[in-house]
Swiss-Prot record:
Pfam family, one: DNA_pol_viral_C
Region (Spacer): 180-341
Domain comment (free text): Terminal protein domain (TP) is hepadnavirus-specific. Spacer domain is highly variable and separates the TP and RT domains. Polymerase/reverse-transcriptase domain (RT) and ribonuclease H domain (RH) are similar to retrovirus reverse transcriptase/RNase H.
Name of the protein in its database record: Protein P
Biological process according to GO: DNA replication; symbiont-mediated suppression of host innate immune response
Activity control note: Activated by host HSP70 and HSP40 in vitro to be able to bind the epsilon loop of the pgRNA. Because deletion of the RNase H region renders the protein partly chaperone-independent, the chaperones may be needed indirectly to relieve occlusion of the RNA-binding site by this domain. Inhibited by several reverse-transcriptase inhibitors: Lamivudine, Adefovir and Entecavir.
Region (Terminal protein domain (TP)): 1-179
InterPro entries in the record: DNA/RNA_pol_sf, DNApol_viral_C, DNApol_viral_N, HBV_DPOL, Rev_trsase/Diguanyl_cyclase, RT_dom, Viral_Replic_Matur_Polypro
PROSITE patterns per record: RT_POL (PS50878)
Organism: Hepatitis B virus genotype A1 subtype adw2 (isolate South Africa/84/2001)
Amino acid sequence: MPLSYQHFRKLLLLDDETEAGPLEEELPRLADEDLNRRVAEDLNLGNLNVSIPWTHKVGNFTGLYSSTVPIFNPEWQTPSFPKIHLHEDIINRCQQFVGPLTVNEKRRLKLIMPARFYPNSTKYLPLDKGIKPYYPDQVVNHYFQTRHYLHTLWKAGILYKRETTRSASFCGSPYSWEQELQHSQRHGDESFCSQPSGILSRSSVGPCIRSQFNKSRLGLQPHQGPLATSQPGRSGSIRPRALPSTRRCFGVEPSGSGHIDYSANSSSHCLHQSAVRKAAYSHLSTSKRQSSSGHAVEFHSFAPSSARSQSQGPVFSCWWLQFRNTQPCSQYCLSHLVNLLEDWGPCVEHGEHHIRIPRTPARVTGGVFLVDKNPHNTAESRLVVDFSQFSRGLTRVSWPKFAVPNLQSLTNLLSSNLSWLSLDVSAAFYHIPLHPAAMPHLLIGSSGLSRYVARLSSNSRIHNNQYGTLQNLHDSCSRQLYVSLMLLYKTYGWKLHLYSHPIILGFRKIPMGVGLSPFLLAQFTSAICSVVRRAFPHCLAFSYMDDVVLGAKSVQHRESLYTAVTNFLLSLGIHLNPNKTKRWGYSLNFMGYVIGSWGTLPQDHIIQKIKHCFRKLPVNRPIDWKVCQRIVGLLGFAAPFTQCGYPALMPLYACIQAKQAFTFSPTYKAFLNQQYLNLYPVARQRSGLCQVFADATPTGWGLAIGHQRMRGTFVAPLPIHTAELLAACFARSRSGAKLIGTDNSVVLSRKYTSFPWLLGCTANWILRGTSFVYVPSALNPADDPSRGRLGLYRPLLRLPYRPTTGRTSLYAVSPSVPSHLPVRVHFASPLHVAWRPP
């Protein structure tokens, strides 16, 4: 007969009113392997091989790798980004505010000024992969929304724009490590000429490009026409290496004359352009390289020289403007749209500052796409950047680890009678500047609308292997494209032209899609909070990533603190969003928990999620282990607040490890459901003197409670860890003390998942809220009783206990540097526990 839920509760000694025998007899029984096996069979916990098909969905939970279909919103608003500029002299400003900084604060702030990123190897992808075809039905809409988002980021100074292989431009205030290029005089339509100080080799190159190339090095004859340059990499004097992409239709932006002329006054340039804008875009920046045969040049115009237009008008190099002088091919021809505007604005925009960068190919290293900003805000979009190449494969980067506060540390730290508020740092990641040397590794961009459409539309034919150039301009015209562009024209106007050109952007601030970013953000905010705490010693400031909380004794005090801290953060260049400041009163909502003076509990929305999960949980049906991962993720978050804690979930963990389906028996489901119906707060640990000690040998146990000594023996010898755990349980139940001294590291760690299942569950309940102090065996007063000697008294130790806040130390204390001697217990082991000797 299967084990009923009532019997199971009695077995686990969870019912207070049951007439169980003395704990010293009952508990060792739960460690019995035979009993554990029988219960597992009864509850159907061990039966991992099932023949029935697996269930792949429970409520909202699907397998870990099944993708929920994302929904594209044509109405998405691109969020606005403030001009974020973290001041370079942040260390000096902090020192003016609080006096000299500690070594750790300095080290952390230097780490992000500027941040550096050196991956082992970088894989370059073609520009076509720049914008991911994430929404196949909304390709054009998604393309323009994403391009607009990228343009917004560039305008806000968050991205660099690659101008040439060795130069980039950006908007906003420059940092000292960004080496600006010297500009030549720009008057009228004179070309922009970069002459970087260190890039040019031995001989100096003349002040302007135009003068050098009066006789064309490329051998372009006037009658050959501009499109003869579709294979510029084949010419003799340019090394093939100098052009990273010969197939990418980046020709020379041509003019009608024979020499390569960078002025904007030749008639073949985009017609009908206003003279005002003419100077802004028509010139080209080029990077100069020395080749063995003299001066070689590399040209990159960002205009795809796609096709010679069919009509007899002048030839444009710009795909968009070529439509202007063509005969419409149908009522859905793009020429109708292009003729709507006289002035389509520049083909290319340049930033306010031009800097030199390491050699950057015309490629991307990650794709981008848009999603909802968050589940509660679907009106705004968020850019997702996929730099997962750096976390994969043999060359993956092992990201630095950093301390995340665990539940007990957090409670010890924040459970107090303070009044709280939390600050919202807007676009926190985009505060931290990246060194330009990282740019070649973090490239995003797009190949331009013509190629994007050509690649995705079925009717366009790329003929004769023409290096990706469209043979016929009108091949890309279609009703769908025309309708989409007409609608987008209402939103973006002349920018449609700008966004239809190819672009390559590199990150100037840390991106979210790289494992380095969370580490850097955590270092940054923890150092800032450390400074704030020292400036206001009677208050508490704490942060986890971009979540910053301030606590003060009274509401008035908190408000004045808020004003002072906000002004300080603004003076450093940190942007706060005042509309999102939340005042919590005396119970703080932080990291998914509610923390008050009584302790910590999970937030209400998590409790509701758990209830919903149990309502949907099927009984006697095998559930896919990937779905079990999701269920365990949710239940594991709230496990410390239940009677039996993590040990109760061990059968689920076991099935996930074995990659087998798990079947919930009615009793096990009822047991878990009951566990999560009553949640108990996790209280903060108090410091005190340890008066109660426990010790055990495989055959017996001993306790020292004050001046009293007790001992007992086990019916059969037990593993030493199990024996020590039983002794600790006896000490707690006999003395009621919340502070127990033990010499066993596993008991100290309070992780009872490696014990026999039934014992782990019960011990977790008995020892809930107990703090342990390490006492060396030689000094343990309970050592003699456990060996059966009651006569000899060792003096009682005065063992003070101080609760720890783990490695999330308040004053950013750096962890001690480990010696290079091998550690006896490996760090990944559950047995390892960080204790400081008394």
